[in-house]
């Protein structure tokens, strides 16, 4: 607890935490705006389905196999629902709050920003839909949320970040925390395919994008304005708390939009 308290009183750590929050909120905002700016994106799903390893039999077979092994299904479900945001939160907490590796966190942020930019540009040009959408698998939602859009499939940004995470964590592979995080991240690609959320090609292109971004930015680090460091620690702490609460609200709304809006409406005294 004393270490966590010290980290949360460290302006270097607080500034970087808020930078990660803001980059994530930027991606959420892009997803919301995509409903408007993505109208000209070309749907290449029919052409994509001509490729091998995209058949209904394969997709349904993998999903049914996974469901037929309850421990495996439970493991993959937990790993998958750790989610995009969860995988980011864990590695940021490990690098910043536990290790205070400022250099690694700066490189991680730079890689995330590049991945957001490249993947977002691709989705604006063309997109495909996920296996569970294409084959209308029962038990899956086709609704867009604050965290996901059904067009954001190839390359899989989730798997891009997984590769970035593993590459960034690799120097800590002999530490227990590093081993656990690398193992957890390594399971996520399998979960996305075996649960029908992604095609095999999504994972592979996501990996390639993650490797390309990491190699391109190998010596880069995100630069943060020096003026922010002149803020008082108490001000940085308040901004951090605000961003944390906003992130929690985003997750709650994304999990069950209708229920979340009903709750917020009740709290605000709405009808």
What residue ranges belong to the model's regions?
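N-terminal transmembrane-helix/juxtamembrane module of multi-pass inner/ER membrane proteins
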Residues: 1-87, 265-271
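Alpha-helical transmembrane segments of multipass membrane proteins
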Residues: 26, 30-34, 38, 118-123, ...
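Hydrophobic transmembrane alpha-helices
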Residues: 166-171, 210-221
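Hydrophobic alpha-helical transmembrane segments
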Residues: 21, 25, 78-96, 109, 158-161, 178-183, ...
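Helix-loop-helix junctions and helix-breaking kinks within/between transmembrane helices
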Residues: 189-206
């Amino acid at each position: 607890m004393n270490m966590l308290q010290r980290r949360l009183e460290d302006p270097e750590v607080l500034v970087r935490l808020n930078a990660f929050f803001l980059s994530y909120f930027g991606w959420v905002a892009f997803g919301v705006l995509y409903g408007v700016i993505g109208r000209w994106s070309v749907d290449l799903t029919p052409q994509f389905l001509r490729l091998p390893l995209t058949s209904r039999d394969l997709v349904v077979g993998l999903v049914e196999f996974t469901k037929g092994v309850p421990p495996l299904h439970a493991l993959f479900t937990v790993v998958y629902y750790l989610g995009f945001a969860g995988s980011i939160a864990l590695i940021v907490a490990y690098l910043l709050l536990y290790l205070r590796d400022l250099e690694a966190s700066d490189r991680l942020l730079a890689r995330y920003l590049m991945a957001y930019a490249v993947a977002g540009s691709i989705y604006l040009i063309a997109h495909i839909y996920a296996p569970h959408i294409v084959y209308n698998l029962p038990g899956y939602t086709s609704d867009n949320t604050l965290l996901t859009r059904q067009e954001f499939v190839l390359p899989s940004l989730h798997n891009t970040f997984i590769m970035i995470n593993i590459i960034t964590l690799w120097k800590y592979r002999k530490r227990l925390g590093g081993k656990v995080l690398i193992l957890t991240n390594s399971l996520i690609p399998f979960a996305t395919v075996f649960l029908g959320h992604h095609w095999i090609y999504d994972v592979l292109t996501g990996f390639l994008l993650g490797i390309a971004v990491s190699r391109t930015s190998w010596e880069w680090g995100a630069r943060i304005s020096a003026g922010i460091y002149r803020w008082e620690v108490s001000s940085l702490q308040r901004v951090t708390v605000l961003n944390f609460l906003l992130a929690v609200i985003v997750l709650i709304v994304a999990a069950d939009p209708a229920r979340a809006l009903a709750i917020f409406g009740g709290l605000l005294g709405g009808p």
